[in-house]
C-alpha cells in the first residue's frame, strides 16, 4: 500500500477537489483519513492507494492544487493501521502495522469491520 499525506486548507470543497484528481486519473483510493492537524486552519488528509505509479501520478497532480500546501509519499515504516471490528463481545479497536492489523481482521472472521492507514 502506498500512502500520501497532504496538508490542505480546512474548508468546504477541498476534499471534493482532491478526490476529483483521483477520479480524473481513474485511481481508486483504498483508505482516507482527514482531520485537523498541527497547523492552524489546515487539515491533514492521508490517502492510500495500491499502485505505486498511481500514487506518484496523484502526487504530481495534487501538488498543483491551490488547496494543497504540502504533499508527501510516506514510506511504510512511517505508516500505521487501525481498525474497528465487530465481534460477538462488542466492538474492538486495533492499532499496529498494516499487515498485522489485516491478519487479525482475517483471523477474527468478523462480518463487519473498517480499516484505515494513517501516517505522519
Q: What are these regions, as identified by a protein language model?
A:
Residues 1-42, 50-120:
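Long, contiguous binding/interaction regions
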Amino acid at each position: 500500500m502506498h500512502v500520501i499525506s497532504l496538508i490542505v486548507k480546512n474548508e468546504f470543497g477541498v476534499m471534493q477537489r482532491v478526490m476529483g484528481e483521483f477520479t480524473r486519473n481513474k485511481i481508486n483510493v483504498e483508505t482516507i483519513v482527514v482531520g485537523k492537524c498541527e497547523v492552524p486552519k489546515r487539515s491533514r488528509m492521508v490517502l492510500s492507494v495500491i499502485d505505486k505509479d498511481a500514487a506518484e501520478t496523484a502526487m504530481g497532480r495534487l501538488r498543483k492544487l491551490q488547496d494543497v500546501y504540502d504533499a508527501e509519499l510516506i514510506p511504510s515504516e512511517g505508516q500505521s493501521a487501525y481498525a474497528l471490528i465487530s465481534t460477538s463481545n462488542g466492538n474492538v479497536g486495533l492499532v499496529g502495522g498494516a499487515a498485522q492489523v489485516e491478519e487479525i481482521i482475517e483471523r477474527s472472521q468478523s462480518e463487519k469491520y473498517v480499516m484505515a492507514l494513517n501516517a505522519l
